[in-house]
């Protein structure tokens, strides 16, 4: 791991974290805060973008280390958030909203798998 790669990860991470904050705030404002729609939205978006980045960076550009560090590890790593998803699912289930918590878990896993698959398929089709 070189210093330039760490800089790429840090830069991408900073942009991803700010993007996540803004998207979650906007979605929560629009959809309401009773259900974690904001986290679901960034995880779906991030999964789709990770699929597109995988095809472009890894398959087409043969794994350009700088772009992989900047986009896939830094930006998309900070944009998506498994730890927040886990806490929100736990919180829903602890507050007697077991069905909502389970629905959130199922939606997150299934829809994010679909999103990454769609990103890969769409990018392969375009490129």
From Swiss-Prot:
Protein name listed in UniProt: Fluoride-specific ion channel FluC
Entry coiled-coil feature ranges: none
Species name: Hahella chejuensis (strain KCTC 2396)
Main subcellular location of this protein, as a coarse class: membrane
Catalytic activity: fluoride(in) = fluoride(out)
Encoding gene (name): fluC
Record lineage: Bacteria, Pseudomonadati, Pseudomonadota, Gammaproteobacteria, Oceanospirillales
Domain of life where this protein originates: Bacteria
Localization in the cell: Cell inner membrane
Family: Belongs to the fluoride channel Fluc/FEX (TC 1.A.43) family.
Transmembrane stretches, start-end: 7-27, 38-58, 70-90, 102-122
A Pfam family per the record: CRCB
InterPro entries: FluC
């Amino acid at each position: 791991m070189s210093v330039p790669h760490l800089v790429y990860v840090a830069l991408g991470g900073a942009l991803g974290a700010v993007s996540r904050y803004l998207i979650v705030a906007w979605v929560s404002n629009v959809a309401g805060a009773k259900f974690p729609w904001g986290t679901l939205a960034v995880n779906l978006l991030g999964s789709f973008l990770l699929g597109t980045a995988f095809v472009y960076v890894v398959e087409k550009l043969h794994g350009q280390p700088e772009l992989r560090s900047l986009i896939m590890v830094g930006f998309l790593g900070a944009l998506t958030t498994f730890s927040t998803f886990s806490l929100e699912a736990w919180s829903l289930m602890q507050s007697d909203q077991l069905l909502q918590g389970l629905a959130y878990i199922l939606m997150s896993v299934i829809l994010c798998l679909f999103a990454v698959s769609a990103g890969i398929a769409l990018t392969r089709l375009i490129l």
